[in-house]
């Protein structure tokens, strides 16, 4: 018979720590949140603005496209501008096809980047492949930069895929084409990592990723990678899609492998709405890690979904206002109120679960449901502290939350000084 502990997260997989511009990935460090810009990197103003927005939202690493000379020339200027803004955010260069040439022709770019991303599927073709891969690895060694060897099923090494398909056809019990593709993805990453080490790049400068667009494929390839190596792993479901579909798919896939102790850094690859907010992917990544109990970024607001007992929208509006206010203030509060990210607030809509849920929170309120007495008990640290009445219940509770934060977490700030 299973015990309660059988369902806890599996221990984190042991991986080699990699220092990416001062941010540690792997080696037991907290799972790192990262994101990527969608600006033209040569447009310095727009790229700086988007990197800054992603960084403020909580992205600890930011990847930028380096696809031509103009982009490469812009990288050190982008880095300098960010530093002038007080943002020491590690920038990752995303290279495809001509990365070896861009790094060689633009040494200031090679120096300014914190990490290089290489795709084994398009770093070079035929007899040029290993040579051009080696040139990038040699640049990483020269500038003491880590690399991410990022395999993507959409640009998979066709020579390796063909070879494994041929071997599979000759096997007595052949695998499905999908299974062979998974194996090819994993082998491509491991073969490339071995080659990088042979050239002289140490394992503590290598991160691996294996991007696919289907949930079950992601679970399979990362489970396979985790069994066959101890490299730090970058998780991400490529082409996850837009809106709720992209969020659900990314959460289902990465949630499973994270629960099994696999993964050292994550990116949620959401397709934004036209002119949409790019920082949404950062928020989703943070929320995924937080709801699973792996990290804490922003205070949690628990709120009931509502039912026939809660025909008023007051509790919904209050929960939304408090959540928005907490998130908006976190850039300042993170330094002003150490530990505030662990705060739990409950905003409940009626008497059924309201008092009980509120007692479990640090501070909670149980608003009156339909037909209930127009009074709202407030619970602080598990004890009923007061009852709010009248037309200003919502604003009164917001003031109580602010006061609670100041009294509880402001003391930590004073003690630290």
UniProtKB/Swiss-Prot annotation:
HAMAP family: IspG. It catalyses: (2E)-4-hydroxy-3-methylbut-2-enyl diphosphate + oxidized [flavodoxin] + H2O + 2 H(+) = 2-C-methyl-D-erythritol 2,4-cyclic diphosphate + reduced [flavodoxin]. This is 4-hydroxy-3-methylbut-2-en-1-yl diphosphate synthase (flavodoxin). Converts 2C-methyl-D-erythritol 2,4-cyclodiphosphate (ME-2,4cPP) into 1-hydroxy-2-methyl-2-(E)-butenyl 4-diphosphate. Belongs to the IspG family. Pathway: Isoprenoid biosynthesis; isopentenyl diphosphate biosynthesis via DXP pathway; isopentenyl diphosphate from 1-deoxy-D-xylulose 5-phosphate: step 5/6. The lineage of its organism: Bacteria, Pseudomonadati, Pseudomonadota, Alphaproteobacteria, Hyphomicrobiales. [4Fe-4S] cluster binds at residues 304, 307, 350, 357. GO terms for biological process: isopentenyl diphosphate biosynthetic process, methylerythritol 4-phosphate pathway; terpenoid biosynthetic process. Keywords: 4Fe-4S, Iron, Iron-sulfur, Isoprene biosynthesis, Metal-binding, Oxidoreductase. It comes from Rhizobium rhizogenes (strain K84 / ATCC BAA-868). It holds the Pfam family GcpE. Binds 1 [4Fe-4S] cluster. GO terms for molecular function: 4 iron, 4 sulfur cluster binding; 4-hydroxy-3-methylbut-2-en-1-yl diphosphate synthase activity (ferredoxin); 4-hydroxy-3-methylbut-2-enyl-diphosphate synthase activity (flavodoxin); iron ion binding. The keyword tRNA-binding does not apply. InterPro entries: Dihydropteroate_synth-like_sf, IspG_bac, IspG_bac-typ, NO2/SO3_Rdtase_4Fe4S_sf. Its cofactor is [4Fe-4S] cluster. Its EC number is 1.17.7.3. PANTHER family: 4-HYDROXY-3-METHYLBUT-2-EN-1-YL DIPHOSPHATE SYNTHASE (PTHR30454), 4-HYDROXY-3-METHYLBUT-2-EN-1-YL DIPHOSPHATE SYNTHASE (FERREDOXIN), CHLOROPLASTIC (PTHR30454:SF0).
């Amino acid at each position: 018979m299973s015990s309660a502990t059988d369902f806890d997260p599996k221990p984190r997989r042991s991986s080699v720590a990699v220092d990416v511009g001062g941010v540690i990935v792997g080696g037991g460090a907290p799972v790192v949140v990262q994101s990527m810009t969608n600006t033209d990197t040569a447009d310095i103003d727009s790229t700086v603005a988007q990197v800054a927005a992603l960084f403020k939202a909580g992205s600890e690493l930011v990847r930028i496209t380096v696809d031509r000379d103009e982009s490469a020339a812009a990288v050190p200027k982008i880095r300098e501008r960010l530093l002038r803004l007080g943002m020491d955010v590690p920038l990752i260069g995303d290279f495809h096809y001509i990365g070896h040439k861009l790094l060689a022709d633009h040494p200031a770019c090679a120096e300014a980047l914190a990490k290089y991303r290489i795709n084994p599927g398009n770093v070079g073709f035929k007899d040029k492949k290993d040579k051009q891969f080696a040139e990038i690895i040699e640049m990483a060694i020269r500038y003491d930069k880590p690399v991410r060897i990022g395999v993507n099923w959409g640009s998979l090494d066709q020579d390796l895929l063909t070879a494994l398909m041929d071997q599979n056809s000759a096997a007595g019990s052949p695998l499905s084409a999908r299974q062979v593709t998974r194996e090819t993805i994993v082998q491509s990453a491991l073969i490339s990592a071995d080659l990088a080490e042979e050239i002289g790049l140490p394992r503590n400068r290598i991160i691996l990723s294996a991007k696919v667009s289907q949930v079950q494929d992601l679970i399979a390839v990362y489970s396979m990678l985790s069994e066959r190596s101890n490299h730090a792993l970058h998780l991400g479901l490529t082409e996850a899609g837009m809106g709720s579909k992209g969020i659900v798919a990314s959460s289902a896939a990465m949630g499973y492998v994270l629960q099994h102790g696999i993964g050292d850094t994550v990116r949620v690859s959401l397709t934004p709405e036209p002119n949409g907010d790019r920082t949404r992917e950062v928020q989703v990544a943070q929320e995924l890690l937080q709801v699973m109990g792996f990290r804490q970024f922003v205070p949690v607001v628990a709120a009931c979904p509502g039912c026939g007992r809660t025909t008023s929208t007051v509790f919904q509006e209050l929960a939304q206002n408090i959540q928005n206010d907490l998130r908006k203030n976190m850039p300042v509060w993170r330094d002003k109120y150490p530990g505030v990210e662990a705060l739990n607030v409950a905003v409940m809509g009626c008497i059924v679960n309201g008092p009980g849920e509120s007692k479990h929170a640090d501070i909670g309120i149980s608003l009156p449901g339909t037909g209930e007495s127009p009074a709202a008990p407030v619970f602080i640290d598990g004890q009923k502290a007061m009852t709010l009445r009248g037309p200003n219940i919502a604003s009164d509770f917001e003031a109580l939350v602010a006061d609670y934060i100041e009294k509880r977490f402001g003391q930590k700030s004073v003690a630290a000084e």
